[in-house]
Amino acid sequence: MSQFENVTVVKAANVYYDGKVSSRTVLFADGSKKTLGLLLPGEYEFGTEAAEIMEMLAGDVDVLLPGETKWQSLSAGESFNVPANSKFGINVKTVADYCCSYID
């Protein structure tokens, strides 16, 4: 899906790591939400409350998922799942565009 229809976008950005990571929240009529974001090159760690599916739209990253010891390389068109109440590491090699879907 390359676009979303009939949604509400929260105007204020979610900004992390001194502006190197930012996203916008997209709210859907069914109560679900996603964030669309941009990651600048660097290494970051994020915590989750809800389970997430991170879809890479552009760029190259390595991710270290909870319970894993080996980094996984991903690029545009690939995705990874993160369990609720966990942390994951992400090493952004090139500017990365992503869509994060939150799973209840």
Curated annotation (Swiss-Prot):
This protein's GO CC annotations: cytosol
EC id: 2.4.2.1, 2.4.2.2
Class of the enzyme per the UniProt entry, highest EC level: transferase
Keywords: Glycosyltransferase, Transferase
SUPFAM superfamilies referenced in this protein's UniProt entry, alphabetically: RmlC-like cupins
Record-stated family: Belongs to the nucleoside phosphorylase PpnP family.
Protein purpose: Catalyzes the phosphorolysis of diverse nucleosides, yielding D-ribose 1-phosphate and the respective free bases. Can use uridine, adenosine, guanosine, cytidine, thymidine, inosine and xanthosine as substrates. Also catalyzes the reverse reactions.
Name of the protein: Pyrimidine/purine nucleoside phosphorylase
